[in-house]
Amino acid sequence: MKKLYEEASVQDIADAIREKTGGAETYRIAQMGAAVRSIPDGDQIAHADIPDYVKDGVLTLAQKVQAVKTASSIVFVTVADAHHATDESTGWKANIDTGNMDACRAIKALSHVIPLDFAAFLGDLTFGYKTTTAAQFEAQCREFHHWIEEGLRGIPQLWTPGNHDTGEYFAAETGSLTNLYGAALIRKYFSDYNAGAVYGSAEAGYCYRDLPGKKLRIINLNTVEGEITGGETAADALSEAQLLWFAQTLADLGSKADSAAWGFVILGHYPLDWGSARAGGKVLKAYLDGGSVTIGGKTVSFAGKNGAV
């Protein structure tokens, strides 16, 4: 009998349902209609449910920001190291879930009282333990995105993964790099949330956003690029392609006619003075010194192209 549907399309519908519910259920075709109808209307985070200590903290922070904010100020929020656990059994799972929900509540409340120029997630979204499977990784990503998205609606975002988002510890425990979560899942739950940015690589997610009104370039690096394919023993944090893109992105910014009026922010999970991420730090130092770098046989000179700081 001829099929009246494409299996990939059915899988896409199931994925969409799970993204909306934050769950990890599987569905037969006959169950999908009921599953869609059961998705609750409105927001999951109600202001009435936000604890007083969160509201008080947000109000105090908002007052401090307002006291120093000027027309040229850049206001943003960063989140990192949620280590979301979902169904993983840990001694501190309850604290993780409570803390992450309250953090998402705080971001939603803050976004209602302070206009945010952008938001960034700097990695280690997932629990990423040696027993964390790819299915658990996906469930953790879906639930956390479901919680945080209400506070970030309409705000330019930049997401980058951390070492606990690669599956490298599960791969090491099982003795097989085939158990890494893979580039496709990293793209789905991190890189794709950078939509609207100027990508160096849509798959790896490194990109930049310009805020012309504030004369700011936000450069988003993937400092675990090597670990996504090579695991915890990967020699390089950033590929040559990413390092070259980083150098060219800095040179492009420094070449602007009004570059001295511009600034930049660099995002990533690892700082650029740590481990093999230092290769990125060398690019940055060469830029600040007005020197040059040669990467993969290509030389980028920053002479006269380093006005932006």
Segment roles from a protein language model:
Residues 1-64:
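Surface-exposed receptor/substrate recognition regions of extracellular proteins
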Residues 51-53, 57-136:
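N-terminal active-site segment of His-dependent metallophosphoesterases
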Residues 65-77, 204-220, 262:
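Beta-strand-turn-beta hairpins that frame and shape the catalytic cleft
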Residues 73-87, 215-229, 267:
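Active-site-proximal beta-strand elements of phosphoester/diester hydrolases
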Residues 81, 123-124, 162-163, 269, ...:
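Active-site glycine-centered loops adjacent to acidic/histidine catalytic or metal-binding residues
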Residues 86-98, 129, 136, 173-200, ...:
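Surface-exposed intrinsically disordered loops and tails
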Residues 105-118, 150-156, 215-220, 231-309:
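His/acidic metal-ligating clusters that form di-metal
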Residues 131-245:
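Extended active-site neighborhood of metal-dependent phosphoesterases/phosphodiesterases
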